[in-house]
């Protein structure tokens, strides 16, 4: 279910000091060309997987310095669910996400923010669990320039949190986990100033190793994210 983190891609592993002093691993990608800013990339429930590393590298290729922290390191360092083990690993991933809690997550995301902010603006994005954490950060992590939240299943449970930076959300119309009626519509009603984009796709449409991957939706959501991050102050 888990694997060692092998440096097989364009980035490298670094250590990040959380705001409460805890040290965690993170995948770091330098920008290609002139630096446009920093991006915090928050994982799904499956850990700091190859998919999340590749998403960080995607932002690096677009000119951003990207850091993807390993959000479960406090409880189970190195936890990664491989694509073939998604069904078996999902329950453990959910348990780790729940056990980590919002305060630990904010401290860890804050530590990454502190690493990136010296060189300019910092934006955040995340997927599934990371989409919810990106919403949390947009509301409670001071100084962020923008947030792009992908299919965050628990955003609808955090409607009292108001993003303090420009924020957009992405959801799939065919997402069996996040219904348009009863979840997404509640987000739209509570936060009419937050653009909510609906795609003809399922949950995890940006994950290339998922059966729900939808290339057109993935591409459009990424373009919208880059546009937001590019104009953010």
Regions found by a protein language model. Name each.
Residues 1-233:
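N-terminal cap/leader regions of alpha/beta-hydrolase-fold enzymes
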């Amino acid at each position: 279910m888990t694997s060692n983190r092998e440096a097989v891609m364009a980035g490298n592993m670094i250590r990040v000091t959380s705001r409460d002093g805890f040290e965690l691993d993170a995948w770091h990608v330098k920008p290609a060309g002139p630096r446009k800013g920093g991006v915090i990339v928050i994982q799904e429930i499956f850990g700091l997987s190859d998919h999340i590393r590749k998403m960080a590298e995607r932002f690096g290729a677009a000119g951003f310095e990207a850091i993807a922290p390993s959000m479960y390191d406090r409880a189970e360092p190195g936890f990664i669910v491989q694509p073939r083990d998604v069904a078996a690993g999902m329950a453990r991933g959910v348990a780790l996400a729940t056990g980590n809690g919002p305060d630990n997550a904010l401290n860890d995301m804050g530590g990454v923010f502190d690493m990136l902010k010296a060189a300019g603006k910092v934006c955040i994005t995340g997927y599934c669990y990371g989409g919810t954490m990106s919403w949390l950060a947009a509301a409670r992590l001071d100084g962020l320039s923008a947030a792009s939240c992908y299919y965050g299943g628990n955003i609808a449970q955090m409607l009292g949190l108001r993003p303090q930076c420009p924020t957009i959300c992405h959801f799939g119309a065919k997402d069996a986990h996040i219904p348009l009626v009863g979840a997404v519509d509640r987000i739209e009603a509570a936060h009419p100033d937050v653009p909510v984009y609906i795609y003809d796709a399922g949950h995890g449409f940006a994950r290339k190793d998922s059966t729900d991957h939808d290339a057109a939706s993935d591409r459009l959501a990424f373009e919208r994210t880059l546009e937001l991050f590019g104009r953010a102050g």
